[in-house]
Amino acid sequence: MIERGKFRSLTLINWNGFFARTFDLDELVTTLSGGNGAGKSTTMAAFVTALIPDLTLLHFRNTTEAGATSGSRDKGLHGKLKAGVCYSMLDTINSRHQRVVVGVRLQQVAGRDRKVDIKPFAIQGLPMSVQPTQLVTETLSERQARVLPLNELKDKLEAMEGVQFKQFNSITDYHSLMFDLGIIARRLRSASDRSKFYRLIEASLYGGISSAITRSLRDYLLPENSGVRKAFQDMEAALRENRMTLEAIRVTQSDRDLFKHLISEATNYVAADYMRHANERRVHLDKALEFRRELHTSRQQLAAEQYKHVDMARELAEHNGAEGDLEADYQAASDHLNLVQTALRQQEKIERYEADLDELQIRLEEQNEVVAEAIERQEENEARAEAAELEVDELKSQLADYQQALDVQQTRAIQYNQAIAALNRAKELCHLPDLTADSAAEWLETFQAKELEATEKMLSLEQKMSMAQTAHSQFEQAYQLVVAINGPLARNEAWDVARELLREGVDQRHLAEQVQPLRMRLSELEQRLREQQEAERLLADFCKRQGKNFDIDELEALHQELEARIASLSDSVSNAREERMTLRQEQEQLQSRIQSLMRRAPVWLAAQNSLNQLSEQCGEEFSSSQDVTEYLQQLLEREREAIVERDEVGARKNAVDEEIERLSQPGGSEDQRLNALAERFGGVLLSEIYDDVSLEDAPYFSALYGPSRHAIVVPDLSQVTEHLEGLTDCPEDLYLIEGDPQSFDDSVFSVDELEKAVVVKIADRQWRYSRFPEVPLFGRAARESRIESLHAEREVLSERFATLSFDVQKTQRLHQAFSRFIGSHLAVAFESDPEAEIRQLNSRRVELERALSNHENDNQQQRIQFEQAKEGVTALNRILPRLNLLADDSLADRVDEIRERLDEAQEAARFVQQFGNQLAKLEPIVSVLQSDPEQFEQLKEDYAYSQQMQRDARQQAFALTEVVQRRAHFSYSDSAEMLSGNSDLNEKLRERLEQAEAERTRAREALRGHAAQLSQYNQVLASLKSSYDTKKELLNDLQRELQDIGVRADSGAEERARIRRDELHAQLSNNRSRRNQLEKALTFCEAEMDNLTRKLRKLERDYFEMREQVVTAKAGWCAVMRMVKDNGVERRLHRRELAYLSADDLRSMSDKALGALRLAVADNEHLRDVLRMSEDPKRPERKIQFFVAVYQHLRERIRQDIIRTDDPVEAIEQMEIELSRLTEELTSREQKLAISSRSVANIIRKTIQREQNRIRMLNQGLQSVSFGQVNSVRLNVNVRETHAMLLDVLSEQHEQHQDLFNSNRLTFSEALAKLYQRLNPQIDMGQRTPQTIGEELLDYRNYLEMEVEVNRGSDGWLRAESGALSTGEAIGTGMSILVMVVQSWEDESRRLRGKDISPCRLLFLDEAARLDARSIATLFELCERLQMQLIIAAPENISPEKGTTYKLVRKVFQNTEHVHVVGLRGFAPQLPETLPGTDEAPSQAS
């Protein structure tokens, strides 16, 4: 067994309290015992500093600072050192029994920052007799010594023979040496690794469960699977390299594309310009001929337009002369129509006002009667009201007098006075001074009779007044009617004038009845007269158009002649139309056919070009589509044969590649599983043992071992048995050989060697005969020889494969070209030449155009004659029906006669219309005019006088009645009778007063009502009188206006005037329309003449310019054609399909190509200059020079060693085939390199299972560990849910996410990161890149979650946390975790260092007093079982029975502080081996 390395001692030089002290370390437990400040922590700090000399990590805080994030300012190191040079050295011996001293030189740096300078070093080959203190100190005297600086130490060691001194500038190199020599358990490559190691030491130093370690147990316990990561990195590197190669190929393809683009654009640029010039030359020739034809045609058109202009100017002058007369007539007719319409409106108003006046007259008479009656009633009401008022006043007076008499007791006197007052009033009214009370009654009868007489007289006069008023009203009415008809006259003449007016009215009515017949007759004659005038005008116009005067009798014969001419010309025009239609149909058919052929020509030409290219590529001539299909079948057969041969060569090449890969495996293992099994069994492959066998001995040993040459050599077969149970991941036959791999020989077999063969006696009854292999593979030399031959074969196969691939791709491209040709051009490639047919059709089209032109000229003349004859017939058709009107000469006289009669009748009708109503009213009352009622006014005065007399008589009778009524008052004599009488009188007076007041009220109401009614009647009467007077005045004004107008206003006058106006308007409109037509036609004719004149000048100029241009271009075109033929590029430039494009399309094509060429040749000075010169449009030959320069440029860049052709186009085709083959080959290689997602998932899952098994094995070692109530400790390892889902998707659902893994833009790591983000969108990835995330996902450790659990008392298994455990339990559990970590590191690092080295194991524990005796014993047992060293710091009351104990006491002597150390070996019954460098007895050092 390999012995584990050990730390022999720790040496402190010039530390605080330790000048030169070496602590010999026990193989198990070393205890530092002492009180507070004794130096225990300083000793451990020196050990840790020598172990990890990283100032960024070192932090020696006190135990009380355990929870602090920062300790003292110097992190605890500066204060533990003394001034000057200090050392901390570890003396070790490894598994190879090599003594190695490693340490650091420390020195305080002056300054307030309290920094420390550290220099790590190592010493090898130091004799065992030399102590570390002797190296770094120099004895000056018996009690004085000096610490050597590092350079003197180096010089001192270099002087010693066999001793090596190494000083390190980096901590990484220092730790690398310590790892290689087995001092530390893990290779510390980075600051992160050093931090983990320091956290481990720090956790063990201060005890307890370190949260920094438990939070990241994966980093501490799980080894980094660098092999898998390296494989992925190599794979991605190979993929990157492959993709870079592909990118380089793409760049080459882009160059090829550039060449192809350059040729294509140069061809487009020059060919488009070349064909444009060719087309323009042909177009210019055609234009010159066309200009000449148009010049001749335009001259003929100008002459015709000039003749036409003269005729239209003459006709326009005639119409201008006639238009003035027509306008004057039309204006007169319009004015007459307006006068007639005005007169009619006036007549209508007059009639309406007359009717209104009659109605107002009637209403006025009625209202006069109503007002008269109202006046009478008003007078009666006034008299009644006045009487009632007088009676009331008298009664009130009497009543007042009576009341006064009662008050003063003078009633008799009052009544007497009242009677006297009444008597006096009666005397006054009746003019009777002698009137007495006794005679009052007699006078009353007299005055009553007088009143009755006056009333009768008044009634008689009233009757007479009414009769006189009626007679006076009728006379006035009749007189006013006569005055309205005849005008003012004397009243005595009214009777005679009225009779004369009635007789005249009868005559006027008779004449008025003849107005309508006369008007109809006049309208008929006027219409005939207008038709006669229109016929005369049409005849004059016809004669003017015909240029000859015709008699009326000649018109019918002329009409027949013109109709016969129209019939003949119509037949001619119809036949010409049919002939023209036939010619045009043929022309359109030719044009359509030409257009169709022109559309088909580019397709046919493209098909011919494609067919010619195919013929050149395959060297065959094709005359029909059947030839093409037959050759395509032959091509398919050749392609199939080439593909079969290529696939066979490719399969053989792949087999060679696989064999080379298999033989290139390290150790000669052809199966990777054997390496894993060898590592698992702790053995070595047999092929690895015989790896150095020579090439000559290889056949022998290959035959000797036969099938077992892939066996695994193990030290002990019995230890392998347990691993074989359930083993499935292994070859079908697994051979195991027991032996020492370091001293293995072939003595395990009994062998007889034959000629080129051996006989191996495996057992007594089993032999094996094996011949020497022709190609031995046993041993590195044999494999390298085979690999070399395989490489040579692979080169041959690769070359053959490339050739076949090139041929296959060439055949495939040819097949694709044939397929494209068949799909695009086969239908038209073997049809007739459309261009030849186009030439034939163009010649026929020219003949048709000439025939059409001649036909058009003839047809134009016939059409003019036909139009003239047609116009003549139309005019005669309008004239012939009016020949009888043209022969009637008396029509105008008859019209004048009827018009005079109509005027007389209309005058009579106007009289009847004006005075008819007055005559009708006058006729029944005309007799009243015989006498004039002049006494009407005197009668009115008498009637008024009688009314006054009747009123006075009534008042006198009333006064006498009152006297008679008061007659008793005169006879009152005594007061008693007076009182009694007064009482009765009072009541009567009151009753009469009430009755009188009521009567007065009624009279007042009646008076007010009748007064209001009378006022209303008077207002109505005044309104009627005002309306009557106003309308009478308006009527007189209207009659005067009608007389002033001087136009007859009958019902037909307006219609006749309107008809006359409309006829004149129509004539004027026709004349103006014709004049406008002539003006427009004349303007158009003049414009046409101007246009034709300008066109003639332009055509002459264009024709001569075109002729000159054609002649000039001919010389330049000849130079271009000569250059094209001399350089042999006519086939490239003369692209006939471009001849069918327009000049704009060709110019656009050339300009686009020019823009692309400027970019393409921007880096080529020569081509850029030639291109710039070629842009001159006046020098087309320079474009040919540019095209020749491009071809020459590309010919110079063709690699003749690869592509053997001078044609750049063919070179590009061959280059494209070769690049396509390389792309295909590299793409297949990339597919081989790429690892599948399922493989990744399997690798990670297997790694996880292996590590879970390893953790399970570690847990078995911790099952028996117990501290306090903690009965056991274990690690739980689980796969994270999100990562488990990722693995499931990678292994089972990867097809759904092939868009990520098949993307060329993503590496495998990036694709894995994208998939993880897709599956877990809720997780925030932060600022990390997909590449970083993917690399983390390739690390299996990130898939696992780890936590420590303890089995504590009755709680069962629970998570190990400091808060849930006691201090001792936490320390023990933490120590168990650290031990597990250290063991894991050793397992991880076993593959990295030599197999003969087992590293040192050492941990710390400060303040161990927190553990009880049982826990301390458990630690000792754990150290013994794991061969681990432990340094414990304990107070004075702890004295362990095992290991070595150092008693530390800090003392001060003469102001000098030092630590007194006493070492004691354990005294338990079972003593460990003696510590190196110490005696069994206790030792003491000062």
Swiss-Prot record:
Keyword Lyase in annotation: no
Lineage: superkingdom: Bacteria
Sites where the protein binds ATP: G34, G35, N36, G37, A38, G39, K40, S41
Compartments (UniProt record): Cytoplasm, Nucleoid
GO MF terms, alphabetically ordered: ATP binding; DNA binding
Main location: cytoplasm
Keywords: ATP-binding, Cell cycle, Cell division, Chromosome partition, Coiled coil, Cytoplasm, DNA condensation, DNA-binding, Nucleotide-binding
Keyword Isomerase (UniProt): no
Region (Flexible hinge): 666-783
Chain segments annotated as coiled-coil in the UniProt record: 326-418, 444-480, 509-603, 835-923, 977-1115, 1209-1265
GO biological process terms, semicolon-separated: cell division; chromosome condensation; chromosome segregation; DNA replication
One Gene Ontology cellular component annotation held by this UniProt entry: nucleoid
Subunit structure: Homodimerization via its hinge domain. Binds to DNA via its C-terminal region. Interacts, and probably forms a ternary complex, with MukE and MukF via its C-terminal region. The complex formation is stimulated by calcium or magnesium. Interacts with tubulin-related protein FtsZ.
NCBIfam families membership: PRK04863.1 (NF003422)
Domain notes: The hinge domain, which separates the large intramolecular coiled coil regions, allows the homodimerization, forming a V-shaped homodimer.
HAMAP family per the UniProt record, alphabetical: MukB (MF_01800)
Matching PANTHER family: CHROMOSOME PARTITION PROTEIN MUKB, DUF4476 DOMAIN-CONTAINING PROTEIN
UniProt record similarity statement: Belongs to the SMC family. MukB subfamily.
Function: Plays a central role in chromosome condensation, segregation and cell cycle progression. Functions as a homodimer, which is essential for chromosome partition. Involved in negative DNA supercoiling in vivo, and by this means organize and compact chromosomes. May achieve or facilitate chromosome segregation by condensation DNA from both sides of a centrally located replisome during cell division.
Record's protein name: Chromosome partition protein MukB
Phylogenetic lineage: Bacteria, Pseudomonadati, Pseudomonadota, Gammaproteobacteria, Enterobacterales
